[in-house]
Amino acid sequence: MPTISQLVRKGREKLLTKKKAPALKESPQKRGVCTRVYTTTPKKPNSALRKVARVRLTNGFEVTSYIPGVGHNLQEHSVVLIRGGRVKDLPGVRYHIVRGTLDAVGVQGRKQGRSKYGAKRPS
């Protein structure tokens, strides 16, 4: 237990919380260019081929981000918008690509939960 004079001299040190999406630099989204588009397998109890892309952001960071939805048109040099949000069964994937913006087209034939996949309202 510190004395009052010790607290006057030093003060308490603030506990710093770790950022969940450091590459965004406090922004809600960031733009970037795909450097590699590939599939990867998830952690132990799950089995699939998850679509991910390595993205070089406008602030110089290079991050791995998940491509949500069924089917995509992304390839190398595609310009995408990324948001925060990790994928629990893919280690190191802490970002999602926003569908329906820039070069990432929305999911075709999507009827429910359309806003998350950039799908237009079916007429």
Curated annotation (Swiss-Prot):
One CC-aspect GO term: small ribosomal subunit
Q: What are this entry's molecular-function GO terms?
A: rRNA binding; structural constituent of ribosome; tRNA binding
The protein's matches in InterPro entries, at most eight in alphabetical order, are given as: NA-bd_OB-fold, Ribosomal_uS12, Ribosomal_uS12_bac
| Single GO BP term | translation
Recite the UniProt keywords alphabetically: Methylation, Ribonucleoprotein, Ribosomal protein, RNA-binding, rRNA-binding, tRNA-binding
Keyword Cell membrane among UniProt keywords: no
Sites bearing 3-methylthioaspartic acid, chain numbering: D89
Which CDD domains does the protein's record reference?
A: Ribosomal_S12
PROSITE patterns, per database record:
RIBOSOMAL_S12 (PS00055)
Q: What does this protein do?
A: With S4 and S5 plays an important role in translational accuracy. Interacts with and stabilizes bases of the 16S rRNA that are involved in tRNA selection in the A site and with the mRNA backbone. Located at the interface of the 30S and 50S subunits, it traverses the body of the 30S subunit contacting proteins on the other side and probably holding the rRNA structure together. The combined cluster of proteins S8, S12 and S17 appears to hold together the shoulder and platform of the 30S subunit.
Cite the HAMAP family for this sequence.
Ribosomal_uS12_B
**Subunit and interaction comment:** Part of the 30S ribosomal subunit. Contacts proteins S8 and S17. May interact with IF1 in the 30S initiation complex.
User: Cross-referenced PANTHER family, in alphabetical order?
Assistant: 30S RIBOSOMAL PROTEIN S12 FAMILY MEMBER (PTHR11652)
Q: Which protein family is named in the record?
A: Belongs to the universal ribosomal protein uS12 family.
What is the protein's name according to its record? Small ribosomal subunit protein uS12
Q: Which organism is it from?
A: Anaeromyxobacter sp. (strain Fw109-5)
Q: What is the lineage of its organism?
A: Bacteria, Pseudomonadati, Myxococcota, Myxococcia, Myxococcales
